[in-house]
Swiss-Prot record:
Keywords: Disulfide bond, Fertilization, Repeat, Secreted, Signal. This is Epididymal sperm-binding protein 1. SMART domains: FN2. Binds to spermatozoa upon ejaculation and may play a role in sperm capacitation. Has phosphorylcholine-binding activity. It holds the Pfam family fn2. It comes from Sus scrofa. The lineage of its organism: Eukaryota, Metazoa, Chordata, Craniata, Vertebrata.
């Protein structure tokens, strides 16, 4: 049997088996999970045409197809080819898309995902973060971590009143890594920036602020 036939047979077996083992799609993915002796830190296509995850730490027949919000968040910094990376990278990507490791060492686990460059999920139709925002009578200016280790943000100026939120883009959360100089978002001339910008640069070079309020602190670095 050639490799293609073996793969198709495996997919068919998984699909047929799934009719009897499929878990409730409302269940959450559990990472890491063990499936047939292998440990998975993210959704997988093993024996399936679509990405899926187990909803138990040890696969017992309960699983679900992965939605975008089911994927784990990026782990920064991570090791790739012996180098430490504090943000999403395109190195090694066949399609030039940003990606990240979902463990601290890609070299060791080879577990990864494509990076989300915009906010997603939540209850506000994937609207972007709004900072600063009021939450539990505090003013917040960065993404917050929930009980499932996901990072989220308010999408209105008053989370306490409106209750609207999204999951934070992977490209945004790198700003929370200790030692990463940029602060995203940062406010420059009364406008929020979520990525490096050339605005205000006489040399037309990308730069970012290292605190939320550039107009107040005037601290910045080139990207």
């Amino acid at each position: 049997m050639n490799r293609r036939s073996s793969y198709l047979l495996g997919c068919t077996a998984f699909i047929l088996y799934s009719y009897e083992t499929s878990g409730d799609t409302k269940d959450s993915c559990v990472f890491p999970f063990n499936y047939k002796g292998f440990t998975y830190f993210s959704c997988t296509r093993t024996n399936s045409l679509s990405p899926w995850c187990a909803t138990r730490a040890v696969y017992d027949g309960q699983w679900k197809y992965c939605l975008i919000e089911d994927y784990p968040r990026c782990v920064f910094p991570f090791i790739y080819r012996g180098r430490s990376h504090r943000n999403c990278i395109v190195e090694g990507s066949f399609f030039g898309k940003l990606w990240c490791s979902v463990t601290s060492s890609f070299d060791e686990k080879q577990q990864w995902k494509y990076c989300e460059i915009n906010e997603y999920g939540g209850n506000s139709f994937s609207k972007p973060c709004i900072f600063p925002s009021k939450y539990r009578n505090h003013i917040i200016s960065e993404c917050l971590e929930d009980e499932s280790n996901k990072l989220w943000c308010p999408t209105t100026e008053n989370m306490d009143m409106d209750g609207k939120w999204s999951l934070c883009a992977d490209t945004r959360i790198s700003s929370l890594v200790p030692g990463f100089p940029c602060h995203f978002p940062f406010n420059y001339k009364n406008k929020n920036y979520f990525n490096c910008t050339t605005k205000g640069s006489k040399e037309n070079l990308l730069w970012c602020a290292t605190s939320y309020n550039y107009d107040q602190d005037h601290t910045w670095v080139y990207c």
